[in-house]
Amino acid sequence: MVVVRLARGGAKKRPFYNMVVADSRRHRDGKFIERVGFYNPRATGGEESLRIQMDRLNHWQSQGAQLSSTVSRLVKQFGRQQKPA
């Protein structure tokens, strides 16, 4: 099954997550099909903390990809950020 999930990157104590489309049997940080965004929980000031390519995410969902619970929460958060702008 294909899933959209977070792959951890960054340094020790400084996490950075890539939002990736991957086969569910692969390791969390292993080989992935496509990168569709990122999440930086430690963003400060004017740094961008969340970016999602919604067109690519919608494409993969239409192909049957499942969202992880965390990615689902972040997509909702991203939608709320985009409405006022």
Curated annotation (Swiss-Prot):
> Mind telling me which InterPro entries this protein's record contains?
Ribosomal_bS16 (IPR000307), Ribosomal_bS16_CS (IPR020592), Ribosomal_bS16_dom_sf (IPR023803)
Keyword Metal-binding carried by entry: no
Q: What are the protein's UniProt keywords?
A: Ribonucleoprotein, Ribosomal protein
GO molecular function terms attached to this record:
structural constituent of ribosome
Q: Name one GO biological process term.
A: translation
Q: Which domain of life is it from?
A: Bacteria
Transmembrane intervals: none
PROSITE patterns named among the record's database cross-references: RIBOSOMAL_S16 (PS00732)
Any one GO cellular component localisation term in the record: small ribosomal subunit
List the Pfam families: Ribosomal_S16
Xref: HAMAP family? Ribosomal_bS16
Membership in a protein family: Belongs to the bacterial ribosomal protein bS16 family.
The family database entries (PANTHER family) matched by this protein are listed as: 30S RIBOSOMAL PROTEIN S16 (PTHR12919), SMALL RIBOSOMAL SUBUNIT PROTEIN BS16M (PTHR12919:SF20)
Question: Know the name of this protein?
Answer: Small ribosomal subunit protein bS16
Q: Which organism is it from?
A: Nitrosomonas eutropha (strain DSM 101675 / C91 / Nm57)
